[in-house]
Swiss-Prot record:
EC number, as in UniProt: 2.3.1.-
Gene: invA2
Thiolation and peptide carrier (T) domain: annotated span: 597-667
Transmembrane segments: none
Protein name: Atromentin synthetase invA2
pH dependency: Optimum pH is 7.6.
Amino acid sequence: MTPIAVTPVAPVDIIYDLKHTERATESSPVTLLDVFSRAVSQYPNHELSFITSSAHDSTIHTKTFAEFNQDVHALAQAMRAWGKPTGSVIVVYLTEHEDNMAAVWASLLAGYVPCLQPALSAQQAHKEGHVGHIKNLFSSATWLTNESGAEQVQSISGLDIHLLSELKASAEAGVDFQAHQPNSDDEAILFLTSGSTGFSKAVVHTHRTILAACHAKGESYGLTSESKIMNWVGFDHVAGSLEMHIAPLLYGASQLHVHASAILSDPLRFLHLIEEKSIQLAFAPNFLLAKLTRDLEKRSDLFGKFDLSSIKRINSGGEAVVSSTAQAFARTLKNLAKDGDASFVISAGFGMTETCAGCIYDPINVLETPPSYEFLELGTPVAGCEMRVVNPEDGVTPRPDGESGELQVRGPMVFVRYYNNPEATSSSFVEGGWYRTGDVGIVEQGKMRLSGRIKDTVIVHGVSYGIPELETYLQTVEGVTHSFLAAAPYRAPGQETEGFVVFYSPTFDLDSEDAPAKLFATHRALRDVSVKLITLPPQQIIPIPINQMEKTTLGKLSRARLVNLFKQGELAKHIDRAEELVSIARGASFVAPSTETEKTLAGIYAGIFNLSVGDMSASENFFELGGTSIDVIRLKREGESAFDLPEIPTIQILKHPVISSLAKYVDSLISKDASQEEYDPIVPLQLTGNKTPIFMVHPGVGEVLIFVNLAKYFQNERPFYALRARGFEPGHPFFTTMDEMVSSYAAAIKRTQAHGPYAIAGYSYGGVVAFEVAKRLEAMGDEVKFTGLINIPPHIADRMHEIDWTGGMLNLSYFLGLVSKQDANDLAPSMRPLTRKEQLEIVWKLSPPERLVELQLTPEKLDHWVDIAGSLIECGKTYEPASSVSVLDVFYAIPLRGSKEDWLNNQLKPWAGYSRAEPSYTDVPGQHYTLMDFDHVPGFQKIFRSRLEARGL
């Protein structure tokens, strides 16, 4: 077989030739600003549309190219006033697509070089180290961010921080502005690598490399000015900014950019948006294809309901695409489509930050052309790109066709260098300009597929995590022998996404009497650390006696050797022994599901968590298995379908998370013998761990589902109880006074935990209730070591008097994600003269249908919920704080109104008068309604836990 390097069929020079041209022509823009100018000139009314990260604002905000052009020119003029030299690097750290997009184009127009900063780590030391590294790398530190971003980096000295809100306020529309005129080889945009194996590197892309990539992508996708694309990848990622924004802009295509949380929290919305906006090109990584398929393949009620005729191609990247997943997804789309003969093209692809995202694609109809391998082939290079597979030892000797080796690429879309890092740049290329991707691939009959990676990373849902960092944390687990632990990426045959395996030597004898208990505790701790660090537990944990764990001459464990032993079955005896010991440890608590209801629920639990039904004990706890608020909704729906019940109330799932307990409740519904339960405000969201329990009081809407995602982070550490308002269940009256509510909650807490010390917290309105409960417990002679107040001032009566029924209904609707923040603010005056029924009808029509389904809402339930929230408002109208507790911990986020500084100094710091010790005031990421949402809860839980530890809990 002959060694090969694959090149595109089309000659490169007819795609892009800029070597002798420094200014744009009508047909060949030379710089990104030429692309922008031409798009605005030729297609002024084409649209850029956006859906933000807010769970409470699901509306689509749209600007024409012409309107967006006016905005960014005004911003560029305001940026010029900073007086920075041309070519200065501006670190852009923003959340929303529109803000990022505007900041990048304004920077380019002003003559600056934008560097897109991904979300910073919630770990203070890691964050400070990264920001300090970036400051040194660029020899300056100009940041353009929002209030939340500024708060995150305020502890790092020497940064020149500019707020986007202030920049917008100083921008003047219509001002005569002379845009910067760059050359094609000037630095255009910098992208930061994941830093998975150390500090991030800054990838330099010039106008030339980006345009070469975008021309080639556009040809591959078949883009035209009539195309419509949808993107939900973050703008700090090359796929979001270059592949799904600048490439379509080059052709004048309209675009819809959706914040990832809007899709991840409701995958069905992916299809609704394709239908609503007639999307032709979209992006969906393998894990989303799998999630959509799981959620929708059995939804026969939706079959034939979607007009998906517009979609021409769905790109998938970031991780390998499982062939069976792609086929199942395509079949599901076919079932959902109104046109039963519809066909769907799924294009797996390969790309990196260094290659301007995708540079190798294989668009195929997976139903008409069944894939030949377990994972979809990645195909052939785009125009201008070449690929080859070589011997990884020398990096230059080509491998024969069909043999694996190191994948290398070259072409005009490959980056030019790492910023201020010539050593890393040099080591990334070999003779001939070939870039070393770090991946292991196979080229066969002109098509490429991946078979592994040389680099020490694991990819979870398209995000790369460093194995060395993961190992560092896993090494700290009790029961692990220091320096005798290794983690390695691994994907089992047929598995949808990549996972990892942990190999370690235990500190205890596996033949000792207490080995089962110790091994069970060690493996549980290893899983907990993994979930908290990278959101994924290990696929397999393999204990290997220390005398059988070989190290290299340099004293290191070889991950490659361990994985090979695992694949070859050489570690089977260790796996079997571990399973035997774990089985012994679980033996006392394992109870096989016995009733038909228990068996059915065991099957549902197993399906949600991808576990074996045979491993499901009747004592399994939904939340200890990792259940999230989204999983609760799935359990509710599947349970109602399996048992043919009109409703299983969400609160009953929260109160009965154990299979056997939930089965008894379901049986009572089936037999119609569900007698009215006595009201108990306590909702146990997780019960494991020996540390002091947390009692978390509901916000002003009365419900506690918002705490589900937070509670799971305390598994095996401390129990987590939520307190839910009275009135949701039939026959339960509303609270009428604050004293009545506090008495009920204090008594319930005492029933659950007889003696202190106590840890109590409350979110928003729940904060003042938590304060009063803490006072009551102290009056009973108990110690309250932690009282957490989350974004609530001590004086709330004036605000309570401002809220009438209409305002309360709109606030609740905004909190539930039924209406946008703007609608919640603007609709009240026109709605107040209407009847309650008419007002509810308006909100109902504005509400996203998928959100109503997710919440299982009816107009009657919403009406009742408004009354519950209203009863809590009434309780707060006469509330005035008095007396004090031993100590307070105040957490503050971006407020609903005003600045964060004013909120802290003038609204929250008066809590000092109600604390016998100096309160702590801790900044948390996010806004008032989003600080515990999908994006912010990982950071919030770390901050919250640190305050518990500071109080000795």
